[in-house]
Swiss-Prot record:
This is Methionine--tRNA ligase. Is required not only for elongation of protein synthesis but also for the initiation of all mRNA translation through initiator tRNA(fMet) aminoacylation. Its main location: cytoplasm. Gene3D superfamilies: HUPs, Isoleucyl-tRNA Synthetase, Domain 1, Methionyl-tRNA synthetase, Zn-domain, Nucleic acid-binding proteins. It comes from Shewanella sp. (strain ANA-3).
Amino acid sequence: MATSQRKILVTSALPYANGPIHLGHMLEYIQTDIWSRYQKLRGHECHYICADDAHGTPIMLKAQQLGMAPEEMIAQVNKEHQQDFADFNIAFDNYHSTHSEENRVLASDIYLKLRANGYIKSKSISQLFDPEKSMFLPDRFVKGTCPKCKSPDQYGDNCDACGATYSPTELINPKSAVSGATPVMKDTEHFFFDLPAFEDMLKEWTRSGALQTEMANKLDEWFEQGLQQWDITRDAPYFGFEIPDAPGKYFYVWLDAPIGYMGSFKNLCDKHPELSFDEFWAKDSKAEVYHFIGKDIVYFHSLFWPAMLHGSGYRQPNSVYAHGYVTVNGAKMSKSKGTFIKARTYLDHLDPEYLRYYYAAKLSSRIDDLDLNLEDFVQRVNSDLVGKLVNLASRTAGFITKRFDGKLAKIADTTLTDAFLAKQEQIAEFYETREYGKAMREIMALADIANGFVADAAPWQLVKQDDQQETAHQVCSNALNLFRILVTYLKPVLPRLALDVEAFFQQTLTWDALNQDMAGHEIAPFKAMMQRVELEKVNAMVADSKENLQATSEPEAPKGPLATDPISDTINFEDFAKIDLRIARIVKAEHVAEADKLLKLQLDIGGETRQVFAGIKSAYSPEDLEGKLTVMVANLAPRKMRFGMSEGMVLAAGPGGSDLWILEPHEGAQPGMRVK
């Protein structure tokens, strides 16, 4: 056991209950599962809990489209999610749903405490209302013409074409995305959480070490912009929890979603009376609470969530750890390319241990995006897991079984064993600090040493010589003991392989048993533990992931982009000459808080720096853009936006969403050059 046992509660973000798990999701659950398994391997009391995020307008509408009750749909999705996670060897101690009695009670409790403490405000607001569906329309459920650039079919909060942000009421010719009806304005009373009241507490907490440096720096920007009152209300019809004392008013999904962590743990406590909910969540709790999340939901977890907990008398998490996005072959996951891969599709073709190892080998404590390069995936799995790790046992175990009664010899020279054991604290530190890539490199470096030892000793030659039998016994026993140590180090990453190795050694692999003397220990006959991954299987997985495109029944219809976006009316040369296009280098790119589609760009145009807000967040992460050359409209009148002044426009092509590409000039171009 560990010298000082810790009490730990760890969570992953709750997957939304309106669709399947994909490999982008799996990064987080694998990352968290490795950390949880490591804590348990060290003898700590660690509870890994999660749940489906099961409320909101999207779920209500999708259930209607499927002709199902929302409760029926989320139950079905929950079952599918749990099966996917189980097959990826994600070892939750409890998996629940935010649509639960535990969560309803806790959400109401927290709200009522916030209200009693003066942190809930009420005011009347005007919102767009769908007269056909008799429902208020959230931002994303209204579409119309952008009030800034006049582009049609834009959402109610942000324009894909020009990057402008606005309120739904500013749209030209707005239409309900639910029914197509023209919405009307209607007043409604909403409740707001007084987030600005917690600014001092949040500034202290975010700089306490609870967040990664990159996250804390981003929060400083949000503090500079000023915290806003947070609307926690949605009007009926809505699938969620009704707000106490407010008939027809429901909690916004982001209020009860993080409370789902508490609800799932309460459900676990009810199953295990020896567990105390208050021991982990009371204000004076000495237990540890950690949240693993994606970088896209930092705002909710590092501002709203700790403020809600503090204002209602609960403890704050020790840390919130964010990770980046998953790209495939250097690009955003794409359905048409077959790189938007569902967890189930992967499982139909490949061993989950492969992906667990590959993600671990590339994960760090930073918020960098992780690229799943499929060719590198094949090479790394085959080289590290099959060629180095399992091969160490496969080429030595047979000699022990056939020639030495299956029993290991006492190692006379422990130099290698001592060197392997000397790495345990460094590897432990890497696991603890989520530097999994560094841990994998240390472990594989040891595997190289072990394989070199076997290759140099050549036991297959020694067993042929009568006077070298004891040496052969020593070499093979030493190799297998090194293999045991390596797999123990890898047990959090490769749990199924660890089970196979435990069956082979006929004992449980534990951290405390790393230095166990294995002399005289009997092993079971060796069985194949891991197969090489073939590129053909990977290609078959990609083929199965490709979106089925419907063939058109009108062969003469226009094809390509012109089919949906015809060429505009002819203009005179004088009109074009008014536009000053310049080469610009993207010096810095940043996310914009509370903007779903915007990135803030700092552009060098040759002796002058411009700030531009661009609606390209769906296609690019900031780090992908920095250093690139692009083309900007340099003489566009500056436009004051909610987030600052935009001093131009960058050019991009594509229909939108993930299929959007900024223009990149030839490398010979220089910032400031005119495009003619």
